[in-house]
Design a protein with these regions (language model features):
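Catalytic cores of secreted/periplasmic lytic hydrolases that degrade extracellular macromolecules
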Residues: 1-128
Length: 128
């Protein structure tokens, strides 16, 4: 899929949601490297398992934390920690990511994140 095809795919699918499709498309492009680094077929935002009860994939990733003692829970586990400038640490760790059955399922889940208390203040700007 070309960059243009990926952007059109996301834009067309997100046009049905109550949010500006340009915002959703831009975020998907950044998070997935134009769809080249998506998780499974449809996780274009790199959304981790969290409280998800659906299918998951265990994928090695890099995380940045402010402590050298960050803990993960099995099956996630720290493979390596590297100290970075500024008191931060780079972790290499297999993480559980949500494995969606469709792009629409991913988009609806992504939108639901903005409705949670932590991001609720951003929801009012979804058409800007």
């Amino acid at each position: 899929m070309t960059n243009k095809e990926f952007a059109q795919w996301v834009y067309d699918s997100s046009g049905k949601l109550d949010i500006d499709p340009i915002f959703v498309t831009a975020q998907a492009v950044l998070e997935s490297g134009w769809g080249k680094k998506r998780i499974g077929k449809y996780n274009i935002f790199g959304i981790t398992k969290g409280s998800w009860k659906g299918k998951t994939l265990l994928i090695k990733t890099t995380e940045i934390h402010k402590t050298a003692k960050y803990a993960y829970f099995p099956p996630e586990r720290v493979e390596s920690v590297t100290e970075l400038p500024g008191g931060k640490y780079r972790y290499v760790v297999p993480r559980l990511f949500r494995d969606y059955d469709s792009l629409e399922q991913c988009l609806l889940d992504y939108i639901s994140i903005f409705k949670k208390p932590h991001f609720a203040h951003a929801w009012e700007y979804r058409h800007d």
